[in-house]
Amino acid sequence: VLDVVGVGATRFRMDTVSKIILRCHPTVIKGNASEIQALYSHQIAMQGVDSLLNTSEVEVQAKALAKHLSCIIVATGAIDIITNGENVVLVHEGHPLMGKVTAMGCVATGIIGAFLAVNSNPLEASVHAMKAMGIAGERAASHSRGNGTMMINFLDELCNLHAYD
């Protein structure tokens, strides 16, 4: 799983991510919507990035990027977009407080990796990982008072998930 943190922030980051993709062929590339847009613009469109694109535009870009790179793209946001270039799954689970907690994206990357270890279908594994994140986030937010308690409660809720959730 390649997390393209801040890929659009500097030329160095974009060049480094491009080299990693070329040499390692990641199974999953994960980023927030603006990171996926930046990667799309560099890999396919070669134009500037409009970070205010809506979900359907990000969906189109993620799908094209997944097809171009032959991998799964996970674009996180209020609605998570997961695609293999052919199929697109939108994950609506989650809570707005999750976006205010530092390192939540890093946690998502780790969870996707864990799900990939036990499910040989990368699209399915990525969808289940993001649904698990969202469900744990919703449950944690219901009894959190702010960002600090949210992270602690999220970790507890994540540990308490069951297959039937």
Name each model-derived stretch.
Residues 5-7, 34:
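Active-site beta-loop-alpha junctions enriched in small/polar residues
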Residues 38, 100-131:
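Short, small-residue alpha-helix embedded
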Residues 11-14, 55-59, 106, 123, ...:
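Electropositive phosphate-/nucleotide-binding environments in soluble metabolic enzymes
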Residues 1-2, 75:
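Hydrophobic residues in well-ordered beta-strands that form the structural core
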Residues 14-88:
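Conserved phosphate/ATP/ADP-binding segment of small-molecule kinases
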Residues 135-165:
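Charged C-terminal helix
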Residues 89-102:
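Short pre-catalytic strand/loop immediately N-terminal to key active-site residues, enriched for Gly-Thr
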Residues 61-66, 122-137, 155:
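Short, well-structured alpha-helical segments that form the helix of a local strand-helix-strand
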